[in-house]
Amino acid sequence: MRETRIEMEIASLEGRLQRSLAIGSLAGARFSARDVEGMRRAMDAQIAREGYYTGATQTNPSFFRIGRYLLTQDAEFEVQGPLTGGEAEVVAIRDGDEIFITVGSDQCDREIDPLFPDKPKQMCPHPIATVAWPYVEIKDHWDQLRIYGEVFVAGHAVPLQDAEIASQVDLEYLLAMAEVRQLADAMVLYCGATPFLEEAIAECIARHHLPEETA
């Protein structure tokens, strides 16, 4: 089997060191809001309205696999068209007994997203940063971490996300789930997106007369 490897700079309190990681699995979490029961009620109601051919899943959080070859640390990459978008997410890397935390973008082909639950994730590269923190050094202030994401459309910055990750389930909750425990190390897990800034996005689109696809 072809090896997929990334080079990560580990920024520790003890200093910085380079770590080469052979990736054993790549996956993403969806519907990972910390209010697990509230999310479950909302998804059950959606399934009742729309039937089982819906975007809602039977469990939450739920997980999807991504081809390891799609993981990239390149600053630029090619996609199929303008309806490809990303979501800034915390990314956890598990390598044996060690956990490292970085950020990445869960890319998705929005054009086919309504038709298939997982295939849109396989349509584009998944970028990940080049620097990570040891989880043991940041877990005591985990809920204070904040993630911000924006995209540039026609030269204008459109804010997408700006939230503390306290809105998401604890990392230990995700790592303890059976689907995650069985993933091969070194495992890379996109931990789920914080909510989009829908009002700010709409205001930016209107102010700069951006194309409707921006939304």
Where are these regions (language model features)?
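Catalytic-core "active-site belt" of small-molecule-metabolizing enzymes
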Residues: 1-187, 195-215
